[in-house]
A protein has these predicted regions:
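Residue-level signal for short, function-critical loop segments
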Residues: 53, 124, 154
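Catalytic active-site module of serine/aspartate enzymes centered on a nucleophile-bearing elbow/loop
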Residues: 165-193
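Acidic catalytic loop of the alpha/beta-hydrolase fold
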Residues: 55-56, 125-129
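Serine-hydrolase-like catalytic core of hydrolytic proteins
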Residues: 1-11, 20, 26-27, 108, ...
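Short beta-strand/loop motif that positions the catalytic acidic residue
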Residues: 114, 119-122, 126
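Catalytic histidine-centered segment of alpha/beta-hydrolase-like enzymes
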Residues: 156-166
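Mobile cap/lid helix-loop segments that gate and shape the active-site cleft of serine hydrolases
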Residues: 24, 61-110, 116, 143
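Primarily recognizes the serine-hydrolase "nucleophile elbow" in alpha/beta-hydrolase
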Residues: 1-67
Length: 193
């Protein structure tokens, strides 16, 4: 298909941001290589995450004790992801019931310094995923000397209009051009989708 395996970047927002993070932070972790083409690296060279989750153990952090309590429930999405649903004699479990499993399912649990460059964007007014999730990822990557940028977008919430404006789009496109250095980078400079 003419894809350069040395210039692969991933981007996602919200749940896709979580997937983008997991893809970037699991570079080189063979337990995630499944299926066909196992002779080809699944590593990526750049990752962009937009208002994604980085730590399943603290999803409610930054929103107050009432929201924290919601995320302690065995019925919370993150608890179901890690522990599965309640069934017959199994009552379910909170996300903190197995901290090791929760961290294994969290991007923060995989940061080891081998990550590609990251661009992390979050809305300053996000009511669904606290900006603390992105700030924690940024600090963890920087602590391991990973090339990472964190942009807190003023007046942006969770997938609302500010995300689809020229300044945000250009920031992401130009970052990919800088990091992945496409062959025709001169033509791509300042590109707008």
């Amino acid at each position: 298909y003419g894809i350069d395996p040395d210039r692969i970047g991933v981007l996602g927002d919200s749940a896709g941001g979580y997937l983008s993070q997991m893809t970037g932070v699991t570079n080189g972790e063979k337990q995630f290589d499944k299926g066909d083409w196992l002779n080809v690296s699944s590593d990526v060279q750049a990752a962009v995450t937009i208002f994604g989750l980085s730590d399943l153990t603290t999803i409610g952090e930054g929103f107050g004790p009432e929201i924290d309590k919601v995320h302690e429930s065995p019925a919370s999405t993150e608890a179901l992801l890690v522990n599965g649903p309640a069934f017959r004699t199994y009552p379910g479990a909170s996300i903190m019931a197995d901290r090791k499993a929760a961290l294994a399912a969290s991007p923060l649990g995989h940061v080891d310094g081998s990550e590609p460059p990251f661009l992390i964007l979050h809305g300053a007014l996000d009511p669904l995923v606290s900006p603390t999730q992105s700030a924690k990822l940024f600090r963890a990557l920087k602590a391991k000397n990973v090339d990472a940028e964190y942009v807190l977008v003023d007046n942006a919430q969770h997938g609302d209009l500010p995300w689809f404006q020229k300044p945000v789009i250009e920031r992401v496109v130009n970052w990919f051009v800088k990091v992945l250095k496409p062959v025709n980078a001169e033509e791509a400079e300042g590109a707008v989708l």
